[in-house]
């Protein structure tokens, strides 16, 4: 894994993607810092950091688009698939390389609260916990991009789909009000979701039986719940998706001044899940 990690880190900086990515986020964070903290005198760097989140939606897809898609495009993925290194080590090596690139501006951000302290009052607990939440949020975004990159051989398609997915999560809080609340509407959404889950399972495993069983169980469960206790389906998906408003966890740190340990665990759980899905996608290609 260490060899893959070093190779990936080297490739990011040799191709300038890593340098541009780190410099871009550092400059954007510095601009917000000057405007809000130095010129306006606002004592919380966490407030400035909130403005950088939008830039992650643009920069992360560029960082993650080549993680697997470029290997498939250049056919160099066959070397990885036939190497003695486990798939978990391959995926983790690539993922940790991207996280390392992202960590550079985050480490630089740690200097800004110290500068605020030189000017007056600083709130280290809020600022540094917000930087931690920002870092983990970025790691989730990178994991999303890596997973989507593993599904295609086109880096451009990987970047576009990642950008679309990140914008969806960014706007999800505003979109929830448009989700239907009736039981029948949520049942239809339930059926569509399990159909997509079945397709995803088949895409990963190429096993029609497993995909069919999972889809069938989902259909039956949804229909049974609808006829037995349909109130459970009312506003079901708007409630569930409300827990996937990833930016709200960060805002708990930066704006509500709450150390949201459960939110950090949510970030870590999503990272583990997406890494696992990427490994399974790679596993399917090894045997196909």
List PLM regions with ranges.
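Helix-loop interface residues and adjacent transmembrane-helix termini in multi-pass membrane transporters
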Residues: 84, 151-152, 258
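Transmembrane helix segments
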Residues: 155-253
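Alpha-helical transmembrane segments and their helix-entry boundary regions
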Residues: 18-19, 90, 157-159, 264
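Secretory targeting signals
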Residues: 29-36, 40-48, 52-55, 97-164, ...
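Alpha-helical membrane-protein architecture signal
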Residues: 2-6, 88, 92-96, 124, ...
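Hydrophobic alpha-helical transmembrane segments
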Residues: 1-70, 111, 203-206, 211-215, ...
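Alpha-helical transmembrane segments of polytopic membrane proteins
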Residues: 50-53, 130-137, 183-195, 212-213, ...
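Helix-loop-helix units of permease transmembrane domains in multi-pass membrane transporters
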Residues: 67-97
């Amino acid at each position: 894994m260490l060899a893959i990690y070093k190779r990936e880190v080297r490739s990011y900086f040799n191709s300038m993607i890593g340098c541009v990515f780190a410099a871009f986020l550092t400059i954007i964070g510095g601009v917000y810092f000057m405007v809000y903290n130095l010129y306006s005198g606002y004592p919380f760097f966490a407030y400035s950091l909130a403005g950088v989140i939008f830039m992650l939606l643009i920069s992360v897809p560029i960082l993650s688009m080549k993680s697997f898609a470029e290997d498939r495009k250049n056919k160099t993925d066959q070397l990885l698939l036939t190497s003695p290194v486990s798939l978990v080590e391959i995926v983790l090596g690539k993922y940790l390389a991207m996280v390392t690139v992202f960590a550079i501006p985050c480490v630089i951000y740690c200097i800004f609260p110290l500068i605020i302290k030189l000017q007056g009052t600083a709130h280290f607990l809020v600022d540094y916990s917000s930087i931690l939440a920002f870092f983990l949020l970025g790691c989730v975004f990178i994991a999303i991009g890596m997973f989507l990159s593993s599904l295609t051989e086109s880096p451009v398609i990987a970047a576009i789909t990642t950008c679309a997915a990140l914008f969806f999560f960014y706007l999800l809080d505003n979109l929830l009000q448009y989700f239907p609340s009736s039981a029948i509407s949520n049942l239809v959404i339930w059926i569509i979701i399990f159909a997509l889950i079945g397709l995803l399972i088949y895409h990963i495993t190429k096993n029609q039986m497993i995909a069919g069983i999972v889809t069938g169980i989902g259909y039956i469960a949804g229909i049974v719940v609808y006829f037995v206790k349909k109130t459970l389906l009312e506003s079901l998906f708007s409630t569930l998706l409300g827990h996937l408003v990833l930016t709200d966890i960060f805002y708990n740190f930066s704006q509500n001044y709450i150390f949201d340990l459960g939110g950090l665990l949510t970030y870590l759980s999503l990272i583990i899940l997406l890494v696992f899905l990427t490994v399974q996608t790679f596993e399917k290609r090894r045997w196909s």
